[in-house]
Amino acid sequence: MKYQKLENQEANWKWIYLIRKHREGENITRYEERSLQEAKAQELLESQNYPSQIEEWIKNHLSPALPIKLDQAIRARRKRFFNGEKQHTKKKSIDLEYAVWLRLSKYSRKMKMTLSETITYMIDERESKAQFENQMAAMKTSLKNLLK
């Protein structure tokens, strides 16, 4: 296993996941009866700060349809949690209009680079162009002063 398991943290993540599913209207329990579902969900809700109770609840009452989804969600959360600790593995997101993303994507493929590398390349090119323009402006100014 690549990432260390943190029992208390993961119990909290499971609690958050299950409560969110419950609030979305999904049955998180193995029971068909609505009143029993609500009672067990309330029991889970009250055990928020007790990781051992959360794990016990999951073992005894979790819907048979959820263990795989729950494990996948926790595995993804664990990965994001540990990758978020280091600056170079921390992921950031930006909102792009579709047309902009499409142009960037085509340019990336043309340059045989990732999107991140392409953006960095474009920024570097723009910075060097600005530096060149500043040097040219300074040279023009000094030439004008020289010719006066």
Curated annotation (Swiss-Prot):
Keyword terms of this UniProt record: Cell cycle, Cell division, Cytoplasm, DNA-binding
Record-linked InterPro entries: Arc_rbn_hlx_hlx, MatP, MatP_C, MatP_N, MatP_N_sf
Gene Ontology cellular component list: cytoplasm
One Pfam family cited in the UniProt record for this chain: MatP_C
Compartments, record wording: Cytoplasm
UniProt GO MF annotations: sequence-specific DNA binding
Gene Ontology BP annotations: cell division; regulation of DNA-templated transcription
Family recorded in the similarity comment: Belongs to the MatP family.
Cited function: Required for spatial organization of the terminus region of the chromosome (Ter macrodomain) during the cell cycle. Prevents early segregation of duplicated Ter macrodomains during cell division. Binds specifically to matS, which is a 13 bp signature motif repeated within the Ter macrodomain.
The protein's assembly and partners: Homodimer.
Protein name in the entry: Macrodomain Ter protein
Higher taxonomy: Bacteria, Pseudomonadati, Pseudomonadota, Gammaproteobacteria, Pasteurellales
Gene name in the database record: matP
